[in-house]
Design a protein with these regions (language model features):
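Conserved, well-structured core segments that form the ligand-binding/active-site neighborhood
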Residues: 169-378
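N-terminal basic/disordered segments at the start of proteins
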Residues: 9, 13-75, 160
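Conserved, well-ordered active-site substructure
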Residues: 58, 432-434, 438-500
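Short acidic, glycine/serine/threonine-rich loops at helix termini
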Residues: 54-57, 129-133, 163-171, 256-261, ...
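Cap/lid and interdomain-hinge subdomains that line or gate substrate/regulatory clefts
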Residues: 32-46, 53, 71-72, 78, ...
Length: 512
């Protein structure tokens, strides 16, 4: 373990964090100007919804029809997100989805006469379908648009989440210490496990030797801070034939140097594809790191979503299909993530009190004979609870895995489908004042299948750099009569301090 400073590495106990060069400060305005001059929109294919937690004021799509993408392209923003949710899919389905999204993007951009740059945003702890996704995206760009990718920029840093890269080794911070990502619980993931913390070795591991570590160029902190844009641009420009380039970052200024270099290389005619963590998107789009939303701002967003519905509800309302939704000022918190940090945060919220707690047994949810009854019973309990309190629904904390990664992913999908069924049954009868989803797969499925969100605006975060608040676009919410827009909070499973879920719920309540 090694103690580190966010920007300089000072205070470290030697090793990779000793003697780092001083930060080269880059104003956000410089990157924003370069982005405008480039004339290219940043299109972020997000493999789960947590990638939006570093940005504000940008659209997010959960559907990728040509019309939806055209809507996003017409918004006056430097970037927008398309939630592909591919991290929850097996390899074949993930590839098919990426292919469909890129085809629709190319067609929409052609109609709107827009140029674009594609970002494959993935996990800052290195889980996900790599290199599958960048391969499929590059192939589809070549076939559909004649665009040949030269280099793949690999920059997994998530500064606010404590995921940083120094000397090509990716680290996870916990308090004032850090551990190499290959030694973390995330490296043991049942679906996306790996062993390498050094990014060049990680590329070799995941590509099964297609790119050997010695053949992978790298951008170090020395390059970023001493060489600057000129040196970094030269490294990026050297990539050909979709060669990955791995990149250090310890602070936002490092990422802004990288962004300016990338824009310069693109202006010179090179095509870069990005496989990155959340922080790079903000830097490359030229967006400011905004302060967390204030209680007053959150209250305004909540009030916009609490206008009473004037139309009848059907389907999952559970009655004759003609009853009106009952509005509640209380919120629904859905915790599907089972990683250790989510479990600690859930326990803290339950200790804090003021919530009704309902736990769903995972083994029961996986039993076709028992699951429907368990979900219906839980939905009744949630509806009753929302009349007087915020309600927390969580899955049991034991981790059930299958004999192989595909089977383990199928278990996670089945559990998530049960949570979606529950949310649909609840919101068909009661409209919560807000919904919080904890965990990547949980967040995506609750947003799309549970709440029917197709288009939304990312309004900001509830904590610095983490926990994103979406405001759905009313006329693009599927089944708007049955599911009026409800403020939706995306809370990644693997980020935040122990009391952060408590803080998020308190802010949404409007508590001091």
């Amino acid at each position: 373990m090694a103690a580190i400073d966010d920007r300089t590495g000072h205070g470290a106990s030697g090793g990779a964090f000793a003697g780092l060069p001083p930060v080269r400060e880059v104003p956000v305005a410089d990157v924003a100007s370069a982005v405008r001059s480039s004339g290219r929109r940043l299109v972020v294919l997000d493999d789960d919804p947590t990638g939006t937690q570093t940005v504000a004021g940008v659209p997010v799509l959960t559907d990728w029809s040509v019309e939806d993408i055209r809507w996003a392209l017409r918004q006056d923003t430097p970037a927008f997100y398309i939630l592909t949710n591919t991290r929850s899919l097996d390899a074949r389905a993930a590839g098919e989805r990426d292919r469909d999204v890129v085809r629709a993007l190319v067609d929409a951009a052609r109609i709107e006469h827009q140029r674009f740059v594609v970002v494959s945003r993935s996990d800052s702890t290195l889980r996900g379908h790599f290199p599958l996704e960048t391969d499929v995206i590059a192939d589809t760009l070549a076939l559909r648009a004649g665009i040949e990718v030269d280099g793949i920029v690999v920059a997994p840093a998530y500064i606010e989440g404590g995921r940083v890269t120094v000397d090509s080794v990716h680290w996870l911070r916990a308090g004032d210490t850090a551990v190499p990502v290959g030694e973390s619980e995330f490296a043991k993931d049942a679906t996306f496990g790996f062993v390498s913390s050094e990014l060049r070795a990680y590329v070799e591991e995941k590509t099964f030797g297609r790119w050997r570590a010695a053949e992978v160029p790298r951008v170090t902190l020395e390059d970023l801070r001493t060489g600057g844009v000129d040196e970094v641009a030269a490294i990026l420009a050297s990539a050909r034939g979709r060669r990955p380039v791995v990149c250090d970052a310890l602070c936002d200024d490092d990422l802004r140097v990288l962004a300016l270099a990338a824009i310069r290389v693109e202006h010179a005619g090179r095509v870069l594809l990005y496989r990155v963590g959340p922080s790079f998107v903000r830097a490359r789009a030229g967006l400011e790191a905004r302060a967390s939303l204030t209680p007053a701002e959150v209250a305004a967003i909540r009030s916009a979503g609490q206008q009473p519905s004037a139309r009848p509800l059907g389907g999952d309302a559970g009655g004759d299909g003609a009853s009106l939704a009952e509005a509640s000022s209380h919120g629904l918190v859905v915790v599907g993530s089972h990683v250790a940090q989510s479990t600690r945060q859930l326990a803290a919220l339950l200790r804090h009190g003021g919530v009704e707690a309902i736990e769903l047994d995972v083994a029961t949810l996986l039993d076709p004979g028992q699951s429907p009854v368990a979900i219906a019973s839980a939905a009744d309990a949630v509806v009753a609870g929302l009349r007087s309190a915020d309600v927390v629904v969580s899955t049991s904390r034991e981790v059930l895995t299958g004999p192989d990664p595909t089977a383990s992913l199928a278990i996670a999908r089945a559990v998530s489908a049960s949570l979606v069924d529950l949310v649909r049954k609840v919101t068909g009868r009661v409209r919560p004042g807000f919904v919080v989803a904890k965990g990547g797969i949980t967040s995506s499925d609750v947003a799309t299948a549970g709440l029917g969100i197709r288009r939304a605006w990312v309004r900001g975060t509830l904590l610095p750099g983490i926990v994103s608040l979406w405001e759905p676009v009313a006329d693009a919410t599927a089944g708007a009569a049955a599911h009026p827009p409800i403020p939706f909070v995306v809370f990644a499973g693997n980020v935040g301090d122990e009391d952060d879920l408590v803080s998020v719920v308190a802010t949404l309540r409007g508590a001091p």
